[in-house]
Amino acid sequence: IRLSLVGSEMCIRDRVTVVNFWYAGCAPCRVEAKDLESVWREYGGEDVAFIGINTRDQADTAQAFSDEFGITYPSLIDVNTAEAKLAFSEVVPIQATPTTLVLDKQGRVAARIIGPIDGTSILSTLVKDALAETP
């Protein structure tokens, strides 16, 4: 799977991938932002990818949110076409924001968290479990 970001591409094939649907005015998104960044800093790298999918904001607003909360993993803006949201709709409809998905190395949804993550432990465990899976 390839995701196009602003001016670049990100390959998530053979990687555990955390996908977080968010927007700047979402109060629970603001609460979970630092925890998501912590898990990204702990696991992000060759084996784990993180991608934020902003469902409502323009690029300037999304960037201001990332700057305010120290978010270093990439996000894409999915406002005009909702292509990213639609890509998951047949497998796991995104009905609330925030929603966080953990995809296994085969790109299958291994876990879904509806609403804010509550601290780092649950997401860390889900990422560890997905990394430990053998195809």
How would you describe each model-predicted region?
Residues 1-7, 11-12:
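Single conserved hydrophobic/aromatic residue that forms the stacking wall/gate
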Residues 1-2, 132-135:
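N-terminal targeting signals for export/organelle localization
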Residues 11, 26-29:
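Short cysteine clusters
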Residues 18-19, 50, 100:
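Hydrophobic beta-strand anchors of alpha/beta hydrolase catalytic cores
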Residues 20-26:
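Aromatic-flanked redox-active Cys/Sec active sites in thiol-based oxidoreductases
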Residues 30-69, 80-88:
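Structural microenvironment flanking redox-active thiols in thiol-disulfide oxidoreductases
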Residues 67-71, 80-131:
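Thiol/disulfide oxidoreductase modules built on the thioredoxin-like
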